């Protein structure tokens, strides 16, 4: 693993620790928890909340991290105009909007849907839609990259872990499919492959909206298919970093700092 990648990980961990323990943040947390009635001591609640915040920040960092890995591989171009941007301007037809919502509802009702057949059919209908009744949409894109040799564009929706509750899980998949609809209108003459990517290998439950084999990649499977760097090397580096004396000391110091707060 090259120095640029390891430096990015180290800097991200350092930034997360600093952001999570700033005096301003701690004052806000004290104010929030002072007015709550709870059997768990206040400072323990604050520490638990900070750990949860760190988890969220690490998930957000993964977009930047995966972008660097893809860019440094050499075989791909990151579409900088769209990738990582939070307010891209797109258009969505009324028919595609309804078509995707109906597909989501159908998947929820059906016990026997064949996603390997129905999902590609949906994507094809979305791509070939000619409805001119359009709505303008401001929308974020996690990662968009192009294979230099084939010209295929890959849309990557990045998630840290497959552990979302039911409501959020539905929203993730709906957003994933609608983003594809935005992109095929933006790039009408280009093959676009949407991939729902989970950084961890863990599979919590089956996806009833998106086929596992063609449009979902988990941890190692994405690295093996798209990247020269090995997933095991990244996994090992982060695990070793998490258990390093310096990192453990940083968390011990944070714990003592919070427990000493009045």
Curated annotation (Swiss-Prot):
GO terms for molecular function: type II site-specific deoxyribonuclease activity. The keyword Nuclease applies. The lineage of its organism: Bacteria, Pseudomonadati, Pseudomonadota, Gammaproteobacteria, Pasteurellales. Signal peptide: none annotated. Its EC number is 3.1.21.4. It comes from the Bacteria. The keyword Nuclease applies. Keywords: Endonuclease, Hydrolase, Nuclease, Restriction system. InterPro entries: HinfI. This is Type II restriction enzyme HinfI. It is an enzyme of class 3 (hydrolase). It catalyses: Endonucleolytic cleavage of DNA to give specific double-stranded fragments with terminal 5'-phosphates. Coiled coil: none annotated. GO terms for biological process: DNA restriction-modification system.
